[in-house]
């Protein structure tokens, strides 16, 4: 059922934990491959990814972020391609392509220090149910591949059919490097989340050196 290439799964127990896992795993995977300088992330304006510190760092909603801002990571924020930002006489697709061009400018300048781009595919839910054209996802995937940046798709709120396809990414016919899932995963009966990732990411952690392993757990949890 998952998008092509996502053959490995890391399970956890609540929504923003999946985002924390994806952020850490992306950075650690790059570091294991000799790229320890990729300490930054790109997120979209008006985004929301949860309220633990890493996830909150990727958010752009002052209500949640402002009071904790001294504690947070500082991502590079790219313009949101949502329809609210359309220029007069601009189509939905043209708006998405214009914002993708601005995303490319950020990547061209900062790709050497960026680990991943994180986004909510098609709908920014907590940001006001703001929607955007699937062509933006196509361009985001192309740019991430070109610049060697991971693509994290946070489908915690939009996965499992909520946008019309089983996963929102399917509407752009793309596969991210990390797919964050929760909510619909258990139909609300059990708090659980999952991060799906690729075989190359998984293999980047295979080593007899413990420091290269993904040591992410809690000593007592549900």
Predicted features along the sequence, with ranges:
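Conserved N-terminal phosphate-binding loop of PLP-dependent enzymes in the Aspartate aminotransferase
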Residues: 1-222
